[in-house]
Amino acid sequence: MKIRFLFFPLILASQFSVTATGPWGSGVPGSPEMLEFEAKWLPMASSPAKMRGHESFNQQKYGMFIHWGLYSQLGGVYKGKKLEEGGTGPRVAEWVMRRKEIPRAEYAKLADSFNPTRFNAEEWVEVAKAAGMKYMVITSKHHDGFALFDSDVSDFNVVDGSPFGRDIIRELEQACEKAGIAFGVYYSHSID
């Protein structure tokens, strides 16, 4: 399967902004951290491929970003406690494993019940197209490590590790191509 990835500068902007603050450095212009940051990331951000992606994204203007994975099953609630109650990390549902400090082995059991039998890629794409959307992006693998595609490097994926057994990313990519909508994926390198 050949997936065409789109560059979305807004996604990267949050991590690779003009200042490197927090765990990445002081953010002080001219500091050793900033000089290293600029040497590594600025050439990447201005490559011809990235510029073409940036131009394409600006022309498309309107699209859909789907954040979906094992965490979706919990709905922001773990053992009766809402995500907002205690824990560490961002207060958003896709961070439930970290925020509620769920042990990996316990969290991985969610794959046993991940079975979205009503998923229909063509219907999702039809809805996007009918709304005038020009692109669709989905989390192919979030920070929890569970892939929504058939991975050659891990069985912790929708095809090998869940009762659903279908490649969601492949189905969406094919439906987007058929409908003439650009397709992209968000892929987290965390837990690779």
Question: PLM features: residue spans?
Answer:
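Boundary at the C-terminal end of the N-terminal hydrophobic targeting segment
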Residues: 14, 19-20
